[in-house]
């Protein structure tokens, strides 16, 4: 297998040292990621932090940084947090994602990885991001992005928002902004082989061309809404109430019904071997149809038409 890979055969690897993290019942903490866990509301609040320094000047500097290189450090932490919550906290059905940081710096890191895409480590980091974003796509949790100040949701980190079921952006006179980079146009494909923008605007190639022309530009809430890049843009007066209602609404539904609904909506477009296995099929055939919520004595099918209230188990797969 190694003989078929690109690049020299005498490369020197980097050490993926154990992640520095603090784990408790209510939080996960990493260098560039914090996750607060609220069992009462069934919410995990993700806060991802952008870089504080500019990217290295060349691939040699990248190799020297190794696991401390911001995109690699962040994606390792995100991967770990996703797996931890999926495995150990099936009671937490809502994941809310926020980002802080300098959007310009984030786009510079995107440009660095693409400029040096022939370097093996740069390529592996991009492939790592592809895998982790796909892992988020197939996670049976309700995903919501909150853009409430700053321009941290830029380039690669805007892919996190595009992976979410809903994107709420605060309409606050341009202090909140998003921006696109080349990473958003096919470099980080989904399981269906399309970019998340292509999946969002399925069949509307003209919209993708339009968005490509404005990559790198800061887009306000009003502009993002007009382009279809966000779900809702509440103002400061309505923000807290709209977000609270959206989360409470998701929490009130059957977790299994949401797993099916969200899988259906996330995997539009071409059916591939990957989506057949990990998209709708896993959600419906391997989970929903066998669960007590559907076929148990207090489930929706036996009680259909009886007038009795269904008792849903809110645990997620």
Please name every model-derived segment:
Residues 154-211:
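CoA-thioester-processing core
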Residues 202, 235-236:
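Helix-capping/helix-break motifs at membrane-protein junctions
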Residues 1-160, 167-173, 212-226, 237, ...:
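C-terminal alpha-helix plus adjacent terminal tail
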């Amino acid at each position: 297998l190694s003989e078929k890979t690109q690049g020299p055969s005498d490369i020197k690897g980097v050490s993926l040292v154990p992640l520095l993290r603090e784990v408790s019942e209510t939080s996960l903490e990493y260098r560039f990621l914090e996750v607060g866990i609220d069992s009462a509301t069934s919410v995990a609040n993700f806060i991802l932090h952008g870089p504080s320094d500019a990217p290295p000047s060349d691939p040699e500097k990248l190799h020297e940084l190794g696991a401390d290189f911001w995109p690699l450090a962040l994606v390792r932490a995100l991967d770990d947090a996703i797996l931890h919550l999926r495995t150990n906290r099936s009671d937490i059905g809502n994941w809310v994602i926020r980002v802080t940081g300098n959007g310009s710096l984030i786009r510079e890191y995107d440009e660095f990885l693409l400029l040096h895409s022939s370097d093996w480590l740069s390529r592996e980091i991009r492939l790592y991001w592809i895998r982790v974003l796909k892992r988020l796509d197939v996670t049976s949790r309700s995903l919501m992005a909150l853009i409430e100040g700053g321009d941290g949701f830029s380039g690669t980190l805007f892919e996190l928002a595009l992976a979410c079921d809903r994107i709420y952006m605060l309409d606050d006179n341009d202090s909140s902004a998003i921006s696109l980079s080349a990473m958003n146009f096919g470099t980080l494909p989904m399981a269906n082989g399309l970019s998340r923008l292509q999946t969002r605007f399925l069949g509307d190639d003209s919209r993708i061309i339009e968005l490509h022309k404005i990559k790198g530009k800061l887009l306000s809430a009003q502009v993002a809404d007009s382009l279809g890049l966000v779900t809702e843009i509440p103002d400061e007066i309505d923000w807290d109430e709209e977000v609270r209602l959206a989360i409470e609404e998701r929490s009130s539904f059957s977790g299994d019904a949401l797993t099916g609904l969200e899988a259906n909506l996330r995997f539009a477009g071409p059916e591939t071997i990957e989506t057949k296995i990990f998209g709708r099929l896993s959600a419906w055939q391997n989970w929903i149809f066998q669960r007590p919520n559907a076929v148990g004595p207090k489930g929706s099918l036996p009680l259909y038409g009886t007038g009795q209230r269904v008792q849903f188990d809110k645990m997620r797969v």
